[in-house]
């Protein structure tokens, strides 16, 4: 019988509470790290038997924890990911992966060097409609795809720590890349207020 890998969730706020619920329902949640008492209360209300702490270092030192899920502010993703991978943990990081291309490339390099799994939470890639579209494109049912238009609605929470591109575009870009399976030749964008 296989054992379920144990995950520590870092951040139990706006989006982290959803990850807390999901990992707990899978019996994969071993601990929750959050800097705030509100985060602790949220974690305990969702997963009452799970360890809740403010210490990320204790999580890194725990050999029973196989990976960490990062649901912290975007500007902290790279640092938490580096620490976790260097401690031998796999990392699931919410979007955006990082706020700079240099940080993203370094995260990828550290994952390679430490033989760690580094996964970004592009949840829309697994949506049934996206999977069906991918199947239709692969089978040729839609012909050759020359152009894709994306329009973002339902913006959700407005964030001040990252710009609109980092906040909203990662899911759209991830879905398009997954559907097409190749890099775009040209990209254009416009915005307004």
Label the predicted regions.
Residues 1-47:
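N-terminal Rossmann-like dinucleotide-binding module
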Residues 31, 67, 147:
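Short, Asp-centered acidic motifs that coordinate Mg2+ and/or phosphate
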Residues 155-193:
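Rossmann-like dinucleotide-binding domain that binds NAD(P)(H)
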């Amino acid at each position: 019988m296989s054992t379920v890998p144990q995950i520590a969730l870092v951040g139990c706020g706006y989006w982290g509470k959803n990850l807390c619920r999901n990992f707990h329902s899978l019996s994969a949640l071993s601990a929750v790290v959050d800097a705030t008492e509100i985060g602790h209360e949220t974690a305990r209300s969702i997963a009452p038997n799970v360890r809740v702490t403010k210490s990320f270092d204790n999580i890194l030192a725990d050999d029973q924890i196989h990976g960490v899920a990062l649901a912290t502010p975007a500007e902290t993703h790279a640092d938490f990911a580096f620490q976790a991978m260097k401690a031998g943990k796999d990392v699931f990081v919410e979007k955006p992966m990082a706020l700079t291309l240099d940080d993203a490339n370094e995260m990828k390099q550290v994952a390679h060097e430490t033989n760690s799994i580094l996964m970004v939470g592009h949840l829309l890639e697994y949506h049934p409609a996206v999977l069906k579209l991918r199947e239709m494109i692969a089978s040729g049912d839609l012909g050759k795809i020359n152009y894709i238009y994306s329009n973002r609605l339902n913006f959700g929470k407005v964030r001040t720590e990252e710009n609109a591109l980092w906040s909203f575009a990662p899911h759209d870009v991830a879905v398009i890349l997954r559907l097409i399976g190749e890099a775009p030749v040209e990209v254009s964008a416009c915005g307004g207020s």
